[in-house]
Amino acid sequence: MKLIEHFLSIQGEGAYAGRLAIFVRFGGCNLRCAGFGVHLKAPNAKELIGCDTIKAAQCENFDFKDTNFSELKNIIKSHNAPNAIIVLSGGEPLLHQKNTDFKDFLRFLVEQNRQVHFESNGTIEPDFNTLPELKNCYFALSVKLENSGESKEKRINARALKSIFANSKGAFYKFVLSGESDEIREIKEILAIQNGGVWLMPLGASKNELEITAAKVAGLAIKHGFNYSDRIHIRLWDNKEGV
């Protein structure tokens, strides 16, 4: 289980934007999302293309170390932020739900009465029976659309979405849009599978890129009765990592 980074910041997007948060980012993802068009040259000289967390999603191309429960517990304590929510991100953090250290970490957080938020792509069904602590968690579901470059079969798991909304403490959708009208049609198709609150966010990994799509996406949110979420961390710190 690779630990990519951890940091204390504010939640930059979605229903809990602005909340003080400890982010713990794990490596590994079951999607590549080349359609988002972020390019990066890895230390092994491989040219990568994917999303704005490409190092986490394609961590096999980087020299990240394995982590364990003891280290993760100490990380939370080191930030000395008892009122912060805990955001488990990636990559796709649910890839690790069968890992013993991950399970121990989640149990520790729940026992400490921490508010735990998963940032997930919604394609993996949480094992609420084997790991009941997942029922105490919130899920921000960034279900991918056609603009991700992934096939519909890979990016939409109806059973997983239904299970998350039925069993978790809370869940909502957040969609990254370029501002095209077809994206709204796709969102409505997903809501027909499993309804839920929706936050629309502009596509972009930098302030300049956000400026291109933000107004158009906000207009779509207003027109179709959805919520709009800016991406505060990008507005404040541009494409800087670890914030």
Model-derived segments and spans:
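Conserved AdoMet/S-adenosylmethionine-binding subsite of the radical SAM
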Residues: 73, 82-84, 94-243
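N-terminal [4Fe-4S]-dependent radical SAM core
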Residues: 1-66, 79, 234, 239-243
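Glycine-rich, highly charged phosphate/nucleotide-binding loops
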Residues: 64-74
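A secondary-structure boundary/capping signal
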Residues: 25, 89-90
